[in-house]
Every structure is written in C-alpha cells, then in structure tokens.
C-alpha cells in the first residue's frame, strides 16, 4: 500500500545527492519508496566549472540547469527549500518551507569555503564557492579592466590579481585567467604587459597530487603566460589592499585590486550542529557510507570523511568520488528497502585532470601521467560525462563541452 512506503529523504542536489536520486528513480518502481529531494536552489550547478565562470571564460548560466530536468516527477518529489536542522534521533529534517520525516536519510549538503581563520579573508577576498560568488567575481574582474581603461589617472593595481592557493581550484582558475585576460585587454584597449597575476601558496609544493614532472609542466605553462608564483609563502591576513604574507619571519603586504581565496573548502556548517565527531563539516563514515549509530543515515560528497579500509586518511572531496558514492548509496538504499544487508563502498580511482585553460592541462589517468592538449580533451570528456550520468544524453548534448 502507498501509505506503507518508506520515506527516503535526500538533502542536496549536488553531484552526490543528484546521482543518488537519478539512480534510485531508475532502479525503483514508483510504489517502492516515497523519495523526496530537497535543495535550496531550483538548479544544479557544475561545481567543477566554477573556476571558468569566475574568470569569465564561460557564462555563469552555462554551468547550471534545472533539477526538474533530471528527476522523474512520478517517482521523486522535488522541494526547493533550505535545510535548517537535522534531528537524526527523531528522524526529522526542518527547512524554511516545512518539516520532513524520513526512514532513510541521505545528507549531501555540499561545501562552503574554508578560510582557516585567516584574519580578513572572508571580508576582503572573493571565494569560488557557488554560482553567485563566481558571477560576482567575473563581473568584478571585468569592471576593474573597464575602470582602468576609462580612468585618466591609471591605477595599475586595477590590473593586479592575487590568488591564494596553488591547489586544484587555484591552478585551474589561473589557467582560465590566462585565457580571459587577452580578451579583456583587447576589449578595453589595455596593455597586457601591465596585468599582474600572482599566486601565493603556503605549502612547499603546488598540486601535491601530481608528480614533479607534471607540476613543472603546469608551472612553466602558467609562468609563460604571465603568472608569478610565491611558493612556501603563508598568507597571514587579508585586507582591502590585498594579502599580508610572511617571508623569512617578516610580514609583507602584497597589493592588488582583486584578491581571490581558493585554498580550502569544508562541508556544510549544518554538520556540526547535527552530528558528533565532525571536523571541518565532514563526518567519518562507516564502510557502507552510513554513520556510526545510524544504519539508515548516509553522509556523502563534501560532508563525508570516508576512510577506506586499511588506510589512515579520508578520501579527498572530488566530484568523481561524490558521484561514485551517490551510485553506491542508491544501491544500498535499494538493499535496505528489500530487507537486505548493505555493501561496503569501494572507490575506483579513474584519474584526475587539472585544466590549464581551455586547451591545455595535466593529469593522471589510470596511473599514467598526461599533459597538453590530450589532457584538455580528456577534461572535456570528464565534464560532459558527469552531465550525461546525471541528466542523460539530451542534457549532455545541450550542456556538455563538445
């Protein structure tokens, strides 16, 4: 009977949550469960494309599409609401649009920027966090070029951009900037030699997930296109002028008209309020992706700190992992509904590609290093495949990179 259907509640329509729902609706009949998906926006956005929208190499509208395009309305109730409280013991979730009970819960609330308590970073630096922050940043950068061109008294700081962090997001953003800046210089009649791009990284090495050869390739590519790197240089503060860094024990002020922070993310702040043992918005999973003490609550994606059996550190937060977790969670939910035991999650690492603008990149694919146009092509394949898996061939054709 319909009233006996188990209530499956999925929070978040990012890669993990939406993958869970799209697989569930394929594998379950309409009367197998009452599935509800809650997301604070009516759209899903490709968070792995935010660096492009932030630089202005794509329009912000290019990276989003309506969640309704991906869900089967006969099987899934999609609710646009913001989650305000998760009561795991009462099996209830509160939102700004009402209260929802659950039998099985999937928490996939995504990430927010993490500034590690650096003084002034939240107030004075742009964050690459979501569609709105990316749109704001790209407009700001173009406005700086327009203002410079229109001003009688030129301020070269308008053409200076500081990027905090030489990890994945920072390097991909810099790559996009090296594509975008020649366009802006041409559009506004600006001498490109006056543009200054500086990347500041506290660690002794950038892109730590890659080999020294790949890192050297990426550094040379970006340096040849005007990027200056300050490695092993911690940022200790951010103000209206730019970053304050520490060099040989002394503080120095780096000045720029635009400061961007890319060096950290964390899970949703709601995690600390809802679960125990949470660090930086992430909770440690059991091997089947549920959490300790709750065999009917799955935590996946950026809110998950999954440590594979026999290892000591959690897997990183990537779209590839999030989507695999979503698929596995859907399979485990089906098992629970059928009265079967859940299965452990096994991550398959197919590789990682870091773009350097639209036509270059570096990466590891099934254990092999790749670089150049081959890497750039593969990145486009990966991006398009993600859309296909969530929204099907039609959406991939419309929104994909080909």
Curated annotation (Swiss-Prot):
GO terms for molecular function: NAD(P)H dehydrogenase (quinone) activity; NADH:ubiquinone reductase (non-electrogenic) activity. Its main location: membrane. GO terms for biological process: aerobic electron transport chain. The lineage of its organism: Bacteria, Bacillati, Bacillota, Bacilli, Bacillales. InterPro entries: FAD/NAD-bd_sf, FAD/NAD-binding_dom, NADH-Q_oxidoreductase. Keywords: Cell membrane, FAD, Flavoprotein, Membrane, NAD, Oxidoreductase. This is Type II NADH:quinone oxidoreductase. Belongs to the NADH dehydrogenase family. One of its GO terms (cellular component) is plasma membrane. Pfam families: Pyr_redox_2 (PF07992). It is found in: Cell membrane. The active site is at residue 172. It comes from Staphylococcus epidermidis (strain ATCC 35984 / DSM 28319 / BCRC 17069 / CCUG 31568 / BM 3577 / RP62A). It catalyses: a quinone + NADH + H(+) = a quinol + NAD(+). Its cofactor is FAD. Binds 1 FAD per subunit. Alternative, nonproton pumping NADH:quinone oxidoreductase that delivers electrons to the respiratory chain by oxidation of NADH and reduction of quinones, and contributes to the regeneration of NAD(+).
């Amino acid at each position: 009977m319909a009233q006996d259907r188990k209530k499956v509640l999925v929070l978040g329509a990012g890669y993990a949550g939406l993958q869970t729902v799209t697989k569930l609706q394929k594998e379950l009949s309409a009367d197998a469960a009452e599935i509800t998906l809650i997301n604070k926006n009516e759209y899903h956005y490709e968070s792995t494309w935010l660096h492009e929208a932030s630089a202005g190499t794509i329009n912000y509208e290019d990276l989003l599409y309506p969640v309704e395009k991906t869900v089967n309305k006969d099987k899934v109730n999609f609710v646009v609401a913001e989650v305000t409280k998760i009561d795991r013991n009462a099996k209830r979730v509160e939102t700004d649009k009402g209260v929802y009970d659950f039998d099985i819960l999937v928490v996939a609330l995504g990430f927010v920027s993490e500034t590690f308590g650096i003084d002034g970073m939240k107030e004075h630096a742009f964050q690459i966090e979501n569609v709105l922050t990316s749109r704001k940043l790209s407009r700001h950068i173009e406005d700086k070029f327009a203002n410079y061109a229109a001003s009688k008294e030129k301020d070269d700081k308008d053409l200076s951009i500081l990027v905090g962090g030489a990890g994945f997001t920072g390097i991909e953003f810099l790559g996009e900037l090296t594509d975008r800046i020649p366009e802006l210089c041409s559009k506004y009649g600006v001498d490109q030699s006056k543009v200054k791009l500086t990347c500041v990284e506290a660690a002794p090495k950038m892109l730590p997930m890659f080999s020294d050869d790949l890192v050297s390739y990426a550094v040379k590519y970006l340096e040849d296109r005007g990027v200056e790197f300050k490695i092993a240089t911690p940022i200790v503060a951010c103000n209206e002028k730019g970053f304050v860094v520490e060099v040989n024990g002394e503080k120095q002020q780096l000045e720029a008209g635009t400061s961007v922070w890319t060096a950290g993310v964390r899970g949703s702040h709601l995690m600390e309020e809802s679960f125990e043992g949470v660090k930086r918005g992430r909770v440690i999973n059991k091997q089947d992706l549920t959490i300790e003490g709750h065999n009917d609550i799955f935590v996946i994606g950026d809110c998950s700190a999954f440590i594979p059996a026999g290892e000591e550190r959690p897997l990183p937060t990537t779209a590839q992992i999030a989507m695999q977790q979503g698929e596995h969670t859907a399979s485990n939910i089906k098992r629970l509904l059928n009265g079967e035991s859940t299965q452990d999650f096994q991550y398959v690492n197919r590789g990682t590609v870091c773009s350097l603008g639209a036509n270059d990149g570096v990466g590891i694919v099934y254990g092999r290093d790749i670089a150049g146009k081959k890497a750039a092509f593969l990145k486009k394949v990966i991006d398009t495949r993600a859309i296909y898996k969530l929204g099907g061939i039609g959406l991939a054709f419309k929104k994909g990179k080909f």
